[in-house]
């Protein structure tokens, strides 16, 4: 399941590379810190370091986009996110457990990305069915 999540994460970052101008993006996560991950995803281990190495590689390949990572306190992650959505200071992207999607969807924090795949020439049929199930909520992706 971790490989599926990481594959989706890498695919999502690739969508960002189609941006036309310089962009700063913040990704928040709740599972550890990893500053020295490098950018070689083939030699990195541990979920936090693998994701950080994907971000580092993405940043190297896309100089007009700067993705930074914010590590949230594990025990307070969802409280922090709710507060930050309420005061318009939420991160651009954040990682969450699937069972939290309804909670955050109800406050308008979940974007439907269904049309984004086709927009960038990607086919949802290329996504592993189990991953597609995990990414689908209330008819959207």
Label each residue range with its predicted role:
Residues 127-132:
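FAD-site-proximal beta/loop scaffold in flavoenzymes
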Residues 134-141:
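Short, well-ordered junction/capping motifs at the entry into regular secondary structure
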Residues 20-109, 118-125, 139:
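Conserved N-terminal structural module of periplasmic/extracytoplasmic solute-binding proteins
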């Amino acid at each position: 399941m971790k490989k599926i999540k990481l594959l989706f994460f890498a695919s999502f970052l690739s969508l960002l590379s189609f941006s036309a101008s310089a962009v700063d993006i913040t990704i928040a996560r709740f599972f550890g810190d990893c500053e020295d991950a490098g950018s070689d995803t083939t030699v990195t281990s541990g979920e936090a370091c693998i994701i950080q190495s994907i971000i580092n590689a993405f940043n190297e390949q896309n100089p007009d986009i700067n993705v930074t990572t914010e590590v949230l306190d594990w025990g307070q992650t969802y409280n922090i996110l709710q507060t930050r959505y309420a005061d318009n200071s939420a991160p651009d992207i954040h990682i969450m457990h699937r069972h939290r999607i309804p909670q955050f969807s109800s406050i308008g924090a979940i974007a439907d990305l269904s049309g984004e795949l086709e927009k960038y020439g990607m086919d949802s049929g290329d996504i592993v069915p189990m991953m597609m199930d995990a990414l689908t909520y209330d008819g959207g992706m």
